[in-house]
Amino acid sequence: DQNGKVVNEKMEPKLPKETLLKMYKTAVLGRNADIKALQYQRQGRMLTYAPNMGQEAAQIGMAAAMEPQDWNSPMYRELNTLLYRGDKLENVFLYWYGNERGSIKPEGVKILPTNIIIGSQSNIAAGLAMASKIRKTNEVTAFTIGDGGTAHGEFYEGLNFAASFKAPVVAVIQNNQWAISTPVRKASNSETLAQKGVAFGIPYIQVDGNDMLAMYVASKEAMDRARKGDGPTLIEAFTYRMGPHTTSDDPCSIYRTKEEENEWAKKDQIARFKTYLINKGYWSEEEDKKLEEEVLAEINDTFKKVESYGANVELIEIFEHTYAEMTPQLKEQYEEHKKYLEGVK
């Protein structure tokens, strides 16, 4: 429940202590990184940023249910998924700093570059999952999308394809109640966003997106279903975007109230999960204080390193990390762009 107490022990996943602590520590790192990134941007030290505050459980619960061989086709509000699955905070900061190297994932981390075009992650996920099915690699591809993103055509195209061919896809709608400044009640006439799965003929479920364990259970069931060859599942994580859409807006002065934010703040998932861990004897207030100090030091050190790199990259780097080897078309585009830049100089 909202106080971190297990309501139904039969539904509680039997996760090892190490996994539960990794979930919590990732959430604490993600929350603090969000807060600091907003500060860096306001100080003119970062181009822009899309914070994840309030959506940690929805992201980490899904990520924890994935196997190492599985793929993510991420949206731009996906910090905690990236961190949990092995991407570096340095890469995330580089990306929002404007350095293309931020899109280069560590070796063995099966995460695609961030999708800025809303809805595009659905088609990419469907195609990647279909390739996995054809190659019999036992991989599942997961993607998340915001409530506003479900109004975009590519969301439907990708899921319809995946459903038709039973491609191993798990789709998670992070329903954070706001599509920039449009409330979800004005963006869709559906009682829930989960029920959009009816049209695809696939299983669907609405989950408390602030309950990390509920998100894990729903995601694990969906991953297992996809891995068995039963096709996609649509999960709606009912949650709330505590921060602005990006650093370019100010929600409370434009389109929502402080009272609304305060009500959702009472449901904070990190405090909820912390209480759960303390009740299980896995965590303490002393350890929590130490973690906060370590996390803040890590964030500050990481951003100093990012600033030392700057935003400059070699032109070739933009082209050579799309495929294992550059295709003839990419090589041609690289040479063409190189000549253009030389002409500009």
UniProtKB/Swiss-Prot annotation:
One GO MF term: pyruvate dehydrogenase (acetyl-transferring) activity
InterPro entries: Alpha-ketoacid_DH_E1_comp, DH_E1, PdhA/BkdA, THDP-binding
Keywords: Oxidoreductase, Pyruvate, Thiamine pyrophosphate
GO biological process: branched-chain amino acid catabolic process
Statement: the UniProt record of this protein carries the keyword Chloroplast: no
Function: The pyruvate dehydrogenase complex catalyzes the overall conversion of pyruvate to acetyl-CoA and CO(2). It contains multiple copies of three enzymatic components: pyruvate dehydrogenase (E1), dihydrolipoamide acetyltransferase (E2) and lipoamide dehydrogenase (E3).
Name recorded for this polypeptide: Pyruvate dehydrogenase E1 component subunit alpha
Organism from which the protein derives: Acholeplasma laidlawii
